[in-house]
Amino acid sequence: MFFKRLVAAGAALVVLAAAPATSQTRPPVRTDHHVHVHAPAIREILTAYCDSPGRISACDPAFVKPLTAKDLLADMDQTGVQTAWIMSTAYLAESPMMVPPLADAADRVHVANAFTVAIAAAHPERLVAFISVNPLAPEALAEIEAWKGEPFAKGLKLHLTNSGVDLRDPGQVRRLAAVFDAASDAGLTIMIHMRTRASDYGAQDVRVFVEQVLPHARGVPVVIAHSGGWGGLDANTWDALEAFRQSLATDHKRFPNLYFDLAQVFDADTPPGDRERLVDLMRRIGVDRFVPGSDWPFSGPLDAYLNDAMALLPLTSDEAEALRLRQVELKTGA
């Protein structure tokens, strides 16, 4: 009888050893590379922005919630996320979607950026601030220059959809390249939501970006938000990711500081076939180029995204652990 109990106990241990990693055994997410907290200067305009005739779609209810850094940190603590990159949403003030345009847009951008930097300064061990601009705004370069040397301003967030950037307009491409130059000069890591409003956005836009804009980042890291899309895995996102794969295929060491975040790219309902296809592309591009990101609060609770949904990706245990621990190294100064 005693022998039978030993055999049964041994079998149970084997089953436990073979089981997937649980929240108790998997490492915490070291960095969520993509979160937001609206500044008061932006919250004041959200109703007008969401009701604007210039909007191309309705605002997500989570977009207008008056959440604070305290809410973010509480969710990070609950989920086990150690640090987060907090993206300023100052660019909303200068969005062409805001109709009529704001008379105080440029001032509002600076105030909103200052708010984001102040949050990071108040929580330097947990939060990293990214200022933001509309790259087509006349004041964009001056706003970037204003934060040069500020120790708590570590990055620049660009949102091409919201800013109305057209990667097929040579003049706008040159202005975007100039913004990359300015960010590089200021030592700011760049986070770019590069999907545009073009209904056929995809490979042709990626090729323009890779050849005419990305080289202007020079040594600073560039993170492609939403893995080249704007959330989800539609035909445009697949086309963009495949174009990035092709651009890196001949020389994997090309653009060593290029990364892709996984913010809202998948969720618990993503079909298994799409998850498999995504992981296949991640491996062909280089799994080490992909980093955790949530798009909080638009992703919902961090635990559901970074723990539950991300665990459904068919990565090997080593790949999954490395992804959770991966953190893009920020520049330490201009």
Predicted regions and their residues:
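Active-site beta-loop-alpha junctions enriched in small/polar residues
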Residues: 36, 89, 132-136, 159-163, ...
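Catalytic pocket-lining loop regions of alpha/beta-barrel enzymes
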Residues: 154-155, 168-291
